Amino acid sequence: MIEDLDADLPEDDAYGIMFAQSQAVREYYIRNEGKHFAELPSIDFSVNGGLSLNGTQPYIVNAFYNPTKNNIYVPAAILQDPFVSLDSKSFEYNLSHIGYTFGHEFSHSLDNTGRLYDHRGNMNNWWKKEDERIFNSKVSDVIKQYELFASWDGIKMDASTMVGESMADISGMELCIGYLNRYLTNLGAIDKIKEQGFRTFFAYLAYQWREAIYKQAIRFNIKTNPHPLVKYRTNCPLARSMIFKNIFNIKKGDHMCWKNDTIWSNDE
């Protein structure tokens, strides 16, 4: 058993408690290396007094979808600036940040992995053969697009390893675009106001993905990260949006032009 290492720490010293518990776990594994043991120490507060690293801790800045439960987890830490701001930021800002995050996670329920589970979280092939064929063709098209866009930057990558995240980005963005369109329509916005709203949304969407990255890190990311590089997380979904291409006058043959296929809607 692991002794109660936080017994002498103040109750409000959350960092001290976490650090002590982390050290205890590390030392426990070292002591038991090569041995068979059933008690696995863990690192997170729970109602049972134990600790476990499960990604749902409120201090985790993340959100994720669980296909076996068909739900999304949104830890409290992401519900603050810069991910959401109800006081000083615009509707378009919040939609492009936390709204896009929600849309992305919702969309994982019907990506290339999530689609294999039914609404109860059971692995079950509930698809009709024809629907499955069409879906798989869309998966192949996403892989083709991301690999092509990367090749223009001299990057060779296997986009099939990250296609689930790519599909969630594409579908999540389309959910936001559809919602923004309905929102502005319900406000009675004229076309010029609508266009400005979309321009603002697209600008914030690109802004939140800004990144400076070393070439060595690029090579590491494309081999280990299930997410595409952020440049392609931005450009590839946008290149599929008819509204984006119309607003910015993007034509066939431009590098930011792909077919108007956002997985679950096809405007062509």
Predicted regions and their residues:
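Intrinsically disordered, low-complexity linker/terminal regions across diverse proteins
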Residues: M1-Y100, E105-E268
